[in-house]
A protein has these predicted regions:
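Outer-membrane beta-barrel strand-turn architecture
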Residues: 1, 42, 54-57, 71, ...
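C-terminal beta-signal and adjacent terminal beta-strands/loops
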Residues: 13-14, 74, 80-83, 208-244, ...
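Residues that define the transmembrane beta-barrel architecture of outer-membrane proteins
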Residues: 42-46, 120-124, 186-190, 253-257, ...
Length: 304
């Protein structure tokens, strides 16, 4: 009983949003730059899954297993770097750098959305959720999940060869390494949510673990091994200090745990205390984006 088999296939395209194509804005010294030449991304997605219910005594729930595959053409992603403040050109060579200075257009640091070419993302999603009834007043609800993702840049070989042949001192690369992976992705992700209820009281926790980030923007970090520093290494040091060393030491898998304790004061009023990042773990999924430290929150909810 309670067995389900599902499959899906979809195909379509997505036009760039107004923000991705036209927005120009400065936020805290970092700019967002428009790209009117950005193209719509196209692709298709296929998924096959199986869902099975289970019941063992007072324990009941579902387990869900799904495999997915997505293929993109002209995939849209953002790139971080230097830009001409007037023409919004991405600075990827000495000539563009000198032109920005000589023309008086000026330079800015920021992000711009662009097409990265062909990509495929596939993986497996495993999850289970259920409830265990201890007695009439006590129950434990849980959700456990694991996701494996393999995000592949299908044009990596030709792009690496083109970038390697470029001997411009200010030549930019698409990402921080020569791997086949897309930027800002993690291969493995694990989560767990548990909530124990007893009469009007409840205590719960959220736990998550993610593996290291596979690649980031070259403008901030270069993970390649070099005999001597190049011009971009000196520029990074001036702009971002020891960010390169920090990322090399801290780009690892990280575990974060949150806790919460609550009570129903009346039928309509609920009070809950939360501690986010209980272990005060220092973590970062992207350079210059450090996760929030331990945080205490008190919530009061009312239904009328």
């Amino acid at each position: 009983d309670y067995s389900f088999l599902c499959a899906s296939f979809g195909q379509g395209y997505r036009n760039p949003s107004v923000v991705e194509k036209y927005l120009r804005k400065d936020i805290g010294g970092v700019g967002v730059y428009p790209n009117e030449n950005i193209r719509a991304e196209k692709g298709y997605n296929a998924e096959l899954g199986f869902k099975q219910g289970y019941k063992f005594g007072n324990l009941k729930g579902f387990i869900d297993v799904a495999g997915f595959y997505t293929r993109y053409k002209d995939m849209i992603e953002f790139r971080f770097g230097l830009f001409n403040n007037k023409t919004f050109d991405y600075i990827d060579g000495l000539s563009k750098l000198f032109n920005a200075f000589s023309s008086g257009d000026g330079l800015g640091i920021g992000a711009q959305f662009t097409n990265v070419g062909r990509a495929e993302i596939y993986g497996v999603d495993l999850s289970t959720s259920g409830v265990y009834e201890f007695n009439r007043d006590t129950r434990l609800a849980y959700t456990l999940g694991y996701v494996y993702t393999n995000p592949i840049d299908m044009d990596v070989d030709s792009r690496n060869a083109e970038e390697e042949a470029n001997d411009d001192l200010m030549a930019m690369r698409s990402k921080s390494d020569d791997s086949k992976y897309l930027k800002y992705r993690q291969k493995h992700s694990v989560k767990g949510v548990f909530d124990l209820e007893w009469k009007q009281f409840n205590i719960g926790t959220n736990m998550s673990w993610k593996s290291k980030t596979l690649a980031v923007d070259y403008f901030m970090v270069d993970e390649r091994t070099k005999a001597e520093p190049n011009l971009m290494d000196y520029m990074r040091s001036m702009l971002f200090g020891n960010l390169h060393d920090y990322w090399a030491e801290n780009n690892k898998g990280y575990f974060v745990m949150d806790m919460r304790v609550g009570m129903k004061v009346t039928k309509n009023i609920h009070v809950q205390g939360l501690v986010n990042n209980l272990l005060n773990k220092r973590y970062s999924a992207r350079p210059m984006d450090v996760g929030a430290p331990r945080t205490f929150i008190l919530q009061v909810g009312a239904n009328f």
